[in-house]
Amino acid sequence: MVPAPPFLGVLENPVPQWDLSILGSIRIRVSHTEVQGSGSSRSPEALRKESLEVEWTLVLLAIPPRIQPSQQDGGPPKCCDLLRAALLGRHCPLCVPAGEVFSQKRDNEQDRSEFIGQTLKLLVKRNVSLELSCR
């Protein structure tokens, strides 16, 4: 099986359904570009790009039982489930504008998968592009 290509386009499909049965880690690269406004007198130095690579190595034994392969289809866990497993209960260590660290806490009452989706959408609204690739 050939690993899936990098995924771009967070709004349409926040987390692609990739088959990770033969893959051991998920790498997330987040980059932010500050765009110079029209009529602004800001110098070219003010246009800066921040990027941060975060890699989670996923230990299958640590994945919650709810995302283990189902007995019915016997299929492997999907990428979205593995990504959620990597992020559950943690701050999201993704870099946003000008050195600001993006940290998003999940309310105990909030559904975990909903939290992941909202976090990714928030990053998009803040002009952050997300590239998700698996290897």
UniProtKB/Swiss-Prot annotation:
Superkingdom per UniProt: Eukaryota
Protein name in the entry: Putative uncharacterized protein encoded by LINC01387
Organism for this UniProt entry: Homo sapiens
Lineage start: Eukaryota, Metazoa, Chordata, Craniata, Vertebrata
